[in-house]
């Protein structure tokens, strides 16, 4: 009899077999589920506090996705040889799991909940994010914690007009779409995607297809819960204090209505603070001992009712716009004189200063991912300091939100970047959010595209992004173009769409309620396209195309090709040759395994010199050619003469002059410059040289050392011109 009450469910999901089990591992957690998809295995656990902390006024959900290096048969690098701070991918995947789970916890549930997902085995072809999301949903479902799930998820690709369900990494390499969709049986809750300029219809079709296919996983979770689930918690939300609601409404409602007639954010924020203070004072005067959290929730509900009612009633939005109007746009390029490219993009009260920097191959980011090391030539970093919203706060390493926003903006721009062989530079974009009132990630997309063009990056098309909102009450709904921060906060769905004139490059949706249909999403995407095209028009008017010249402060680059066998000669022993080259010419030199060499410098002369010297190092000595040589060493029977970098040959004593030479020191000395002819090269690469043959061909002469400076007379005719000749 086993000590474990192990429950296993297995199902076929597209091309993959999925196995879920609970009851054996991590039994002291509230819920624990192992998910195995073709050898990619995750352990998902959830624990919830039995009661909320005193004064808790928000739902404290924490999601940690952790990749263990042993999952891929690796040992961590670094001094301590153990996993450290989360990688960017771990942070992004944690957010991916958090977003569809958070809306499904009941209103008023303020207990701490921690979801931890460990990747314990990885098949490099099967990404772990979808198994992790399914596992987290299943762990919550079996735990009995109040949760309106389960959630399913799927990755959708698109190639040759066909949707791909949970494609492998190899299949994703040629797919025009990478879309992750998550939701419940009845509704889509989250979409995260990157696309190669696809139409709205194709994108919506992918969302619908993904929602259909995830039902297989949802049904399997239901089966797992029936056999291995724990009893549901006996939890109910605290009863509403109707007397308090009435009192707060009496004081706050007229004041809040006044506040939401103020069009400027700073004035409105100040007024809302005054309203809150007035409510607190009125309650104290009435002798009501009210909980601050409860009062705050009532105020939030009143604000939502006012804003949502105004919009659904056809009244102007918070800042006076109708539902389709984009805020005024101002664009300025070349803002920073020493930066390689820069743009200031302002849309209403949201502003991004985006700066582009061009670098060389050595500036690429090397990412030691669980599935294998790779290099990234395009980076986008998003920063939002507290002053952007008129607040004080911590300044330092990026938070999860900043990493997520930067990733979304990056995904929007990747499809229009030139290929490596067209533009060999490493590119870094930094978006500094200097003002924020909604849609700062989409401002980063617009400003990022303009900064790239200002830097001379030949992007394929302009890319613009717009953040949309949606308010749904029964059968009535309103789609909002270019939402404000308050509209995002008080709405039912926010989605961000970025793309070109030809199609969508990135789409992100977060839906807080059920009941948003395919038809509503269709209307929302059509309105988003209208807004995107309006912004694209403004951008194209400000900068029609990328600059044809790079900034004077950006490095120039040339590429050349050598035989791969010659790479070691360019590098030299212990890197001595290439180090000397870079130092003496003031260049950066990168060598690929296929023999492609990239030389970069702000000095054109330095690049040309480095190229010339590399050509000399890699040049092949040709029999019958005459070279400038330097005597390196004298021997009894001849001399060692260098004719090319790394190419030394033997000048035999019989090949110096036609007469008999008794002592070589009578004719040659170390350091002496000579014109010598290569007369033989054997299969081992040994070279035989002749001074007398060169003299005979060029018509020069040589005198004994003791007769003066022994040097061949200059030839009357020009010698054969080679790159190696020019080097000397």
UniProtKB/Swiss-Prot annotation:
Localization in the cell: Cytoplasm
Entries under PROSITE patterns matching the protein: KH_TYPE_1, S1
Cofactor annotation: Mg(2+)
Coiled-coil annotated residue ranges, if any: none
Biological process per Gene Ontology, one example term: mRNA catabolic process
Chain intervals for the UniProt region annotation (Disordered): 702-728
This protein's name: Polyribonucleotide nucleotidyltransferase
Taxonomic placement: Bacteria, Pseudomonadati, Pseudomonadota, Betaproteobacteria, Burkholderiales
């Amino acid at each position: 009899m086993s000590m474990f009450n192990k429950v296993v469910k297995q199902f076929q999901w597209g091309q993959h077999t999925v196995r879920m089990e609970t009851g054996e591992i991590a039994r002291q957690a509230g819920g624990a589920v192992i998910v195995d998809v073709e050898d990619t295995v995750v352990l998902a656990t959830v624990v919830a506090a039995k009661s909320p902390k005193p004064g808790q006024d928000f739902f404290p959900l924490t999601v940690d996705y952790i990749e263990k290096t042993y999952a891929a048969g690796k040992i961590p690098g670094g001094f301590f040889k153990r996993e450290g701070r989360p990688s960017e991918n771990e942070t992004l995947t944690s957010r991916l799991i958090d977003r569809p789970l958070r809306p499904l916890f009941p209103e008023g549930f303020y207990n701490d909940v921690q979801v931890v997902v460990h990747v314990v085995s990885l098949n490099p072809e099967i990404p772990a994010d979808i198994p992790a999301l399914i596992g987290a949903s299943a762990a919550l479902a079996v735990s009995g914690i109040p949760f309106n799930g389960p959630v399913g998820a799927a990755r959708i690709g698109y190639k040759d007009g066909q949707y791909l369900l949970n494609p492998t990494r190899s299949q994703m390499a040629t797919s025009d779409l990478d879309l992750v969709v998550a939701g419940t049986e009845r509704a889509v809750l989250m979409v995260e995607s990157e696309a190669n300029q696809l139409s709205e219809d194709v994108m919506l079709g992918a969302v619908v297809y993904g929602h259909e296919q995830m039902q297989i996983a949802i049904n399997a979770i239901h089966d797992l819960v029936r056999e291995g689930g724990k009893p549901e918690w006996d939890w109910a939300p605290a009863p509403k204090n109707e007397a308090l609601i009435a009192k707060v409404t009496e004081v706050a409602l007229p004041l809040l209505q006044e506040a939401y007639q103020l069009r400027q954010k700073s004035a409105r924020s100040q007024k809302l603070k005054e309203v809150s203070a007035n409510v607190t004072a009125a309650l104290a005067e009435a002798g009501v001992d009210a909980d601050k959290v409860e009062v705050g929730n009532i105020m939030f509900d009143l604000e939502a009712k006012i804003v949502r009612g105004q919009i659904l009633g056809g009244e102007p939005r918070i800042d006076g716009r109708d539902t389709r109007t984009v805020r005024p746009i101002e664009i300025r390029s070349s803002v920073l004189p020493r930066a390689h490219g820069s743009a200031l993009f302002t849309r209403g009260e949201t502003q991004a200063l985006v700066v582009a920097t061009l670098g060389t191959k050595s500036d690429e980011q090397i990412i030691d991912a669980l599935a294998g090391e790779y290099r990234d030539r395009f980076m986008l970093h998003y920063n939002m300091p507290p002053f952007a919203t008129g607040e004080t706060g911590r300044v330092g390493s990026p938070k999860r939100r900043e990493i997520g926003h930067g990733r979304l903006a990056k995904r929007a721009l990747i499809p229009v970047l030139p290929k490596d062989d067209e533009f060999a530079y490493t590119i870094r974009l930094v978006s500094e959010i200097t003002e924020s009132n909604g849609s700062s990630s989409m401002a980063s997309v617009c400003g990022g595209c303009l900064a790239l063009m200002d830097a001379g990056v030949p992007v394929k098309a302009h890319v613009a992004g717009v953040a949309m909102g949606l308010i749904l009450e029964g059968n009535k709904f309103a789609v909002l173009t270019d939402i404000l921060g308050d509209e995002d906060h008080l709405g039912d769905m926010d989605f961000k769409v970025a793309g070109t004139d030809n199609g969508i490059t990135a789409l992100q949706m977060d839906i807080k309620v059920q009941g948003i249909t395919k038809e509503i999403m269709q209307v929302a995407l059509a309105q988003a396209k209208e807004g995107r095209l309006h912004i694209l028009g403004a951008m194209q008017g400000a900068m029609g195309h990328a600059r044809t010249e790079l900034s004077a402060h950006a490095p120039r680059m040339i590429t050349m090709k050598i035989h791969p066998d010659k790479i070691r000669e360019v590098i030299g022993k212990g890197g001595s040759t290439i180090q000397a080259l870079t130092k003496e010419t003031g260049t950066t030199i990168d060598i690929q395994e296929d023999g492609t060499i990239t030389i970069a410098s702000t000095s054109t002369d330095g690049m040309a010199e480095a190229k010339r010297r590399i050509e000399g190092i890699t040049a092949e000595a040709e029999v019958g050619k005459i070279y400038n040589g330097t005597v390196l060493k004298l021997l009894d029977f001849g001399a060692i003469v260098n004719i090319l970098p790394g190419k030394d040959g033997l000048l035999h004593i019989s090949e110096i002059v036609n007469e008999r030479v008794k002592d070589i020191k009578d004719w040659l000395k170390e350091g002496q410059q000579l014109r010598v002819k290569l007369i033989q090269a054997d299969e081992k690469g040994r070279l035989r040289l002749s001074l007398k043959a060169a003299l005979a061909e060029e018509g020069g002469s040589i005198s004994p050392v003791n007769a003066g400076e022994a040097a061949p007379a200059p030839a009357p005719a020009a010698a054969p011109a080679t790159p190696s000749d020019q080097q000397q």
